[in-house]
């Protein structure tokens, strides 16, 4: 079939040519198959919106690890899962489903709802906006320090704002190095959520 004159395919295999980016919005049971289909057929980056993996227990964590393994085996990187998408004002790209005010702030947020709140406040109270946004969720593959490195070298981003609930195991030193290096180039603001016991429980869903 078609949508607005553009062809639709049931899979990347059916499409017949690779894509730079895939948005993966399927139920949890179909997620691994979707990642495999994309990775095997040359997709460079997948944005996994689907939740219910590492934040939901051992079985979810196992599936999450397998998705990352399959993706990386074929040279594909994965944003998320359990994420709210990405936004790039310079590229004219908005994969969040929300209207984001443009400006020169790079926002890296583990929580989608916190990201939405910051967009609203920036537009309505500070009269500013964003150059880049990523809601990175579980950071199963691409960790927060990698987003920081990108934004640190991005001439369109004058300030980096990070909302962080937790780091991927083993990535603490990388985070410190990246944040410290970025702070030598531009202001870096970090808001740490999930400090209390109740906050940690709420933060585990990244919503």
Give, region by region, the residue ranges found by the protein language model.
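Catalytic-core regions of core metabolic enzymes
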Residues: 1-207
């Amino acid at each position: 079939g078609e949508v607005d004159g553009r062809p639709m395919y049931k899979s990347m295999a059916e499409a017949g040519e690779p894509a730079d980016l895939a948005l993966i919005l399927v139920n949890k049971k179909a997620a691994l198959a979707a990642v495999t289909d994309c990775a095997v057929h040359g997709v460079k980056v997948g944005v996994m919106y689907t939740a219910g993996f590492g934040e939901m227990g051992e079985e979810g964590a196992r599936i999450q690890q397998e998705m990352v393994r399959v993706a990386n085996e074929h040279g594909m990187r994965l944003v998320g899962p359990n994420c709210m998408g990405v936004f790039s004002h310079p590229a004219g790209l908005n994969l969040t489903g929300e209207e984001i005010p443009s400006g020169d702030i790079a926002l890296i947020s583990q929580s989608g709802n916190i990201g939405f709140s910051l967009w609203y406040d920036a537009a309505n109270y500070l009269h500013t906006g964003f150059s880049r946004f990523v809601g990175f969720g579980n950071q199963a593959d691409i960790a927060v320090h990698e987003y920081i490195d990108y934004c640190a070298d991005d001439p369109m981003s004058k300030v980096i704002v990070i909302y962080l609930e937790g780091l991927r195991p083993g990535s603490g030193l990388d985070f410190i190095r990246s944040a410290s290096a970025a702070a030598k180039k531009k202001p870096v603001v970090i808001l740490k959520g999930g400090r209390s016991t109740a906050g940690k429980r709420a933060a585990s869903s990244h919503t």
